[in-house]
Amino acid sequence: MKGLLFIISLLFLTLHQRVWAYQVEGMKSDVICADIRFTVHCICNELGRFPTARLTKPCPWPNRERRSTDDEDYLFEEDEDEEFFHPRALSRPTAAKYDDEILEDEVSFHSRTKRDIAFHEECCNIRTEHKCNRTTVELYCRRYSP
């Protein structure tokens, strides 16, 4: 019985570990799984893309001035002061072009507006992935040079 409890506890701890989203160097954050499209909108505005677009609610991070350090090792450290780390350029997978044929991933863009797709194309291009409520969501982040 104790062995079974130990195995279940170990399995729970393994599955419950924290997964960080891909970030611009020196940044780390959790993905806001419930509202990825709004997060992309916030990030595009923060990066100065589509600055005329008005947000209907505040962006999900309280203090956009503070950033984590530029040390890459810092990306994997835990920190109690999480409220200052915010997402960068999150999105869903794009259609991949292969020769003259376009291959769609499991998420279709037919239901998305042209403006949503424009946000995605403007802000995102480096691929990684993150587990969002047991669903893999692909994230993209363009590195902007100052």
From Swiss-Prot:
Keywords: Cleavage on pair of basic residues, Developmental protein, Differentiation, Disulfide bond, Glycoprotein, Hormone, Secreted, Sexual differentiation, Signal, Spermatogenesis. Glycans are attached at N133. Residues 68-113 form a propeptide. It comes from the Eukaryota. InterPro entries: AGH. GO terms for molecular function: hormone activity. It comes from Porcellio dilatatus. This is Androgenic gland hormone. The gene is AGH. The keyword Membrane does not apply. GO terms for biological process: cell differentiation; sex differentiation; spermatogenesis. Pfam families: AGH (PF17558). Controls sex differentiation and the formation of male appendages, spermatogenesis, pigmentation, and male specific behavior. It is found in: Secreted. Disulfide bonds join C33-C123, C42-C59, C44-C141, C124-C132. GO terms for cellular component: extracellular region. Residues 1-21 form the signal peptide. Androgenic gland. The lineage of its organism: Eukaryota, Metazoa, Ecdysozoa, Arthropoda, Crustacea.
